[in-house]
């Protein structure tokens, strides 16, 4: 199997100043690039987002939100993705952000220019915080292989963010690991002040008015197994916490914050059937089926998210700044499968990040280096450790022996098993941005850097997990009734499986400007020892400021972006290497001596290649 994705698009990149930025501000963004980080709103009439390139020209398409922008924006749950709802390049998931899932508190899945959500790169202070442990499965809990993680490894409170930048095309070579875009969040540093803020908020369904189509049945008991909390017509959410910053000395200070989000979602558990396999001498297999009705009712699903952040910043000299940041993000979900008896489960996600960074300004330019350790854990525990599925076929026979009627009923009970997976990453990154150099009338500016990471992943199953399938065939005729029961068992063996892989990237860019014409050429070279690919990603962008005031700029670019290697594939062989099937009933208490056969579904992993997107952008006539 080869995972390649190629995208060729034509876009209008030449236009007047964006509708949300005045021409005067667009011009100032070009004339005063050194002040780009201190963006002010374009007017007092409403919230404004000013799109600026950090180098002072429109070579890169991105949206930049300052702390002031973030403070003004209403958010549903305080997540970073809540800040991006007005970005035209960002599309939100219908499932994660719909009106019928208002009890959820996790960040919504987003797509940038149509790419899958897990092929965006989420960075915190320049360090990638993506969870690569099967993020594509995070909307479904029915997988027996993994609990399902989320592409965002940290659910950071936006109150602790100093700025957010979304890069969607013509992205600099310093960024990699995406085919969609980059969401770059910079955390707050000590501003030289001392203050503390305490906050709290609450909302619930009784304070809202949800409009639904009367022709649709959207009760919580109508959700299917793959989306057990699909319809949340009743919910209650709370958020509370504090943020503060204090100076320890004249040039050393800290920022500390804690946020807790809670959600209660009363959901209907429909009446079900507990399916048990018991000894039965009347059956040729020696086993039979016992069905026990289980009453339904309303049960409360719960979600809890904790976020802690602490950052110490030392302004050692006017030219040197050092910081040490600790971020913790925890999430817990308690739920059940609506139509399955005894199916209660708990999902846990924990993320821990420790980042040390130093930024040094010198005559030649700015050197920015960081070293980080990140650990993310996903864990699932089930009330019942195994799963039983009963499918009963009733076949009516006429006098001639032909089938006259056929019907089928099904019942399932049990859980999805206990699982735990861990991703640990050590990352080192450095970048040098040189000061511009004039050669005659031509301005030259160089930047270069390196990005190294080492990843260790573990997958743990504490005990054997069994999935029992029972098929009953009941044939009815005028001569009587005959039935046959067959059993099928799938077993996932207990064990701990590990995988390691390393990645390295080198990147460099050259910016050349002549008057109002600018060309930026870049190259990013990447290697990882899982796919053993050497990926060369060229980046090229050129822009022409037609009138020299930033109001009308034509931009043309051709770029290649290589995506993420999902850790699931590195673990896949180990995970399913212990999966076996047998056409019989078997358990730890009643093991089958013979008849097991392997059920591998991981062929072709050695042929995997790194996914990539290739984008060409050309202007249309003005």
PLM regions: where:
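Periplasmic N-terminal accessory/gating domains of Gram-negative outer-membrane beta-barrel systems
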Residues: 25-41, 55-172, 179-182, 186, ...
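Hydrophobic, lipid-facing positions within transmembrane beta-strands of outer-membrane proteins
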Residues: 108, 181, 236-242, 306-310, ...
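Outer-membrane beta-barrel channels and translocator barrels
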Residues: 117, 158, 188-190, 249-251, ...
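Short strand-turn segments of transmembrane beta-barrel domains in outer membranes
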Residues: 162-170, 182-187, 192-245, 296-301
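Transmembrane beta-barrel wall of Gram-negative outer-membrane proteins
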Residues: 194-197, 229-332, 349-362, 538
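Transmembrane beta-barrel strands of outer-membrane/channel proteins
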Residues: 196-204, 256-260, 324-330, 369-375, ...
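Solvent-exposed loop/turn elements at secondary-structure boundaries
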Residues: 409, 422-429, 445-447, 467, ...
């Amino acid at each position: 199997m080869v995972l390649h994705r190629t995208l060729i698009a034509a876009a209008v990149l030449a236009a007047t100043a964006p509708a949300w930025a005045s021409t005067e501000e667009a011009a100032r963004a070009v004339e005063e690039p050194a002040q780009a980080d201190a963006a002010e709103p374009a007017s007092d009439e409403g919230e404004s987002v000013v799109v600026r390139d950090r180098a002072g020209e429109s070579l890169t398409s991105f949206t930049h939100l300052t702390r002031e922008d973030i403070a003004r924006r209403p958010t549903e749950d305080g997540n970073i993705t809540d800040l991006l709802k007005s970005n035209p390049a960002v599309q939100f998931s219908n499932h994660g952000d719909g009106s019928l899932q208002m009890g959820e508190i996790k960040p919504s899945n987003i797509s940038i220019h149509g790419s899958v959500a897990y092929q965006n790169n989420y960075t915190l202070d320049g360090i990638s915080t993506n969870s690569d442990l099967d993020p594509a499965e995070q909307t479904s809990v029915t997988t027996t292989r993994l609990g399902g993680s989320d592409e965002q490894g940290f659910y950071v409170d936006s109150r602790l963010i100093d700025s957010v930048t979304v890069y969607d095309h013509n992205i600099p070579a310093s960024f990699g690991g995406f085919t969609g875009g980059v969401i770059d969040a910079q955390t707050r540093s000590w501003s030289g002040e001392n203050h503390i803020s305490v906050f709290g908020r609450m909302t619930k369904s009784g304070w809202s008015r949800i409009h639904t189509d009367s022709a649709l049945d959207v009760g919580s008991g109508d959700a299917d197994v793959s989306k057990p909390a699909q319809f949340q017509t009743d919910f209650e959410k709370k958020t509370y916490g504090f943020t503060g910053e204090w100076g320890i000395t004249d040039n050393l200070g800290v920022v500390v914050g804690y946020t807790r989000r809670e959600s209660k979602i009363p959901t209907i558990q429909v009446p079900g059937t507990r399916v048990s396999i018991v000894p039965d001498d009347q059956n040729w297999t020696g086993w039979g089926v016992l069905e026990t009705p289980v009453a339904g009712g309303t049960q409360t699903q719960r979600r809890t998210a904790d976020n802690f952040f602490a950052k110490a910043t030392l302004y050692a000299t006017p030219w040197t700044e050092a910081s040490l940041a600790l971020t913790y993000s925890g999430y817990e979900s308690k739920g059940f499968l609506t139509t399955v008896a005894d199916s209660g489960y708990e999902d846990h996600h924990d993320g821990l990040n420790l980042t040390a960074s130093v930024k040094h300004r010198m005559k030649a330019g700015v050197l920015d280096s960081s070293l980080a350790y990140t650990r993310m854990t996903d864990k699932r525990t089930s009330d019942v450790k195994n799963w039983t599925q009963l499918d009963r076929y009733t076949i009516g026979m006429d006098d001639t022996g032909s089938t006259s009627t056929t019907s089928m009923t099904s019942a399932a009970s049990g859980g999805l098993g206990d699982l735990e997976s861990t991703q640990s990453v050590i990352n080192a990154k450095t970048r040098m941005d040189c000061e511009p150099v004039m050669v005659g009338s031509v301005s030259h500016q160089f930047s270069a850097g390196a990005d190294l990471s080492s990843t260790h992943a573990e997958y743990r199953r504490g005990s054997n997990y069994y999935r029992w399938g029972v098929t009953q065939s009941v044939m009815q005729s005028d001569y009587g009734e005959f039935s046959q029961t067959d059993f099928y068992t799938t077993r996932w063996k207990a064990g701990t499986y590990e995988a390691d892989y390393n990645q390295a990237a080198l990147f460099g860019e050259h910016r050349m400007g002549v008057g109002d014409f600018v060309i930026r050429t870049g190259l990013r070279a990447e290697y990882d020892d899982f796919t053993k690919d050497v990926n060369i990603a060229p980046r090229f962008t050129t822009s022409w400021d037609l009138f020299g005031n930033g109001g009308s700029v034509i931009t043309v670019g051709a770029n290649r972006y290589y995506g993420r290697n999902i850790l699931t594939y590195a673990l896949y062989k180990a995970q399913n290497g212990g999966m076996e099937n047998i056409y019989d009933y078997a358990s730890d208490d009643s093991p089958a001596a013979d008849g097991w056969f392997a059920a591998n579904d991981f062929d072709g992993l050695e042929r995997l290649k790194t996914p990539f997107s290739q984008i060409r952008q050309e202007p249309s006539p003005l």
